Regions:
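Conserved flavin/dinucleotide-binding core of flavoenzymes
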Residues: 2-4, 8, 19-20, 28, ...
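Short hydrophobic core segments
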Residues: 10-12, 35, 154-169
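Glycine-rich FAD pyrophosphate-binding loop
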Residues: 26-49
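Short beta-strand to alpha-helix junction loop
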Residues: 57-64, 101-119, 253
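A short alpha-helix-loop-beta-strand transition element characteristic
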Residues: 67-87, 206-215, 270
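A conserved short coil-to-beta-strand element within the FAD-binding core of flavoproteins
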Residues: 131-146
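Flavin (primarily FAD) binding-site architecture
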Residues: 162-182
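Central beta-strand plus flanking loop segment that forms part of the substrate or channel wall
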Residues: 181-210
Length: 346
């Protein structure tokens, strides 16, 4: 193993929380290294080349951090399409419900939410972001500094920011000095959307709008249980997306989804020009392999043991699951990142 490289802060994970923390810390004068296991940035922010989100997509009224960030980065927002009726599916068949049952105003990001993380990554100092560097060990070293290992390399840092879900952190990183109570808690914190598949169907036009439908649906039959319009500004590109419990998707998932979209929206619904299934439960760096067998207790989000630094104030949790407000949202990820930055710079 190589000699340890000295740095101020190592950030583990290049999702929205990790990149936001790294940009802020670098801007405050800290020497920062960002280590990302995947071959891309973004984490659970992932968009197709057409700008359609396979991960986080929405922002909501009152979420000031993400709106401020989008404006600062020059990422435009637009309103989620809500106009039209909802389709409801249960054992009795498919019914059309007047109005949109899911009518909470929300906004999306032109070009996809991954535009936020792409822009943040571009703002980091050259050479500070290392992809395909899964961290395998964080230990307390000489002088109380934390030693971080990844791909046979080592870094020695004053602080480490764990910007990945707590259960993934304790599942993939050797943390021998972490107090047992913290490690046990982290292992039980469910990953937001970690057992969900997001399905995106793209069409030549938003034909459902012409029929007075919102592109929204609720189903008790599945596999998609909740469906929304995912179209870009002005309906271009035209798309619908739905959430499905990953456990309900079998080897014939694509055929299942096409059949359901046909039931919900008619023959044209069953014939998208493309269909993408993003099963987040199969992402090693998003969800532990045995996560489906763990209790999904979201009351543990923002737990005091995970919203406070560990290891004498040197190890900081910064994923959305550790946020004390807006946990699960991009806003929560930014709040957690900001908390870590304040603890390090304050």
């Amino acid at each position: 193993m190589s000699e340890a490289q000295e740095t101020d802060v190592v950030v583990v994970g290049a999702g929205i929380s990790g990149l936001a923390a790294a940009e802020a810390l670098a801007g405050a004068g800290s020497d920062v290294v960002v280590l990302e296991a995947r071959s891309r940035t973004g984490g659970r922010l992932l968009s197709t080349p057409e700008g359609l989100d396979l991960g986080a997509s929405w922002g909501w009224d009152g979420e000031a951090r993400v709106l401020t960030l989008a404006r600062r980065l020059g990422v435009a927002t637009y309103a989620q399409h809500l106009a039209g009726d909802t389709v409801v599916e249960d054992l009795g068949g498919v019914l059309r419900h007047p109005g949109n049952l899911i009518d909470v105003p929300a906004h999306r990001y032109a070009g996809g939410a991954a535009g936020l993380t792409d822009a943040l990554a571009r703002r980091l100092p050259a050479g500070s972001l290392l992809l395909e560097h899964p961290v395998d060990r964080v230990v307390v070293g000489a002088g109380g500094r934390l030693e971080v290992g990844a791909r046979g390399r080592r870094w020695r840092a004053r602080h480490v920011v764990l910007a990945l879900p707590p259960s993934v952190a304790v599942d993939t990183v050797d943390l021998p000095d972490l107090p047992g109570a913290v490690a046990r808690l982290a292992a039980t914190v469910p990953v937001w959307m970690g057992q969900v598949a997001k399905v995106v169907a793209v069409y030549d036009e938003p034909f459902w709008r012409h029929a007075g439908l919102a592109g929204a649906a609720a189903s008790r039959l599945g596999p998609l249980q909740e469906v929304h319009d995912l179209s870009g500004p002005g309906g271009d590109p035209a798309a619908i997306f739905g959430f499905a419990p990953a456990a309900l998707l079998g080897p014939d998932a694509e055929a299942q989804v096409r059949a359901q979209l046909g039931r919900l929206f008619g023959p044209r619904g069953a014939e998208p020009r493309s269909l993408t299934i993003a099963d987040w439960s199969r992402e090693r760096w998003t969800s532990p392999a045995d996560a489906a067998a763990r209790p999904a207790d979201r009351s543990r989000y923002g737990h005091p043991l995970l919203s406070a630094p560990a290891l004498d104030g040197r190890l900081h949790w910064a994923s959305t699951e550790t946020a004390t407000s807006y946990a699960g949202h991009v806003e929560g990820a930014l709040a957690a990142a900001g908390r870590a930055v304040d603890a390090i710079t304050g």
